[in-house]
């Protein structure tokens, strides 16, 4: 299997007051990475569904919504409707419900990604990898 490398700048480093300009400045990228943080699963809070919907209005680049939130399954459909092209979730947030969450993402019409922390053994996600369009190991 060939390795595919994609360039996906994160809007987390952008000036949110100039989001349109910031996204325009990376228009040659393969996709835009959007880190959605809830202040519970991770200590920071970023943005939610509206920011994704607003980004969708100003770019045709694929949007990768990286959900760093508890109970991501509750928000999959809303992020898909907002314009996400990929929804990536953490094994650590889904636990035993991981396969069901990945299937829910697929059934919502978007591509799914799986994220693991560096200390999570790959064996924990081996059987779910075939369900995924992308796998990300945090750094």
Where on the chain are the PLM-derived regions?
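Histidine/lysine/aspartate-rich catalytic loop segments that bind and position anionic ligands
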Residues: 115-139
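Conserved N-terminal beta1-alpha1 strand-loop-helix module at the mouth
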Residues: 1-88, 92-100, 104-112, 125-132
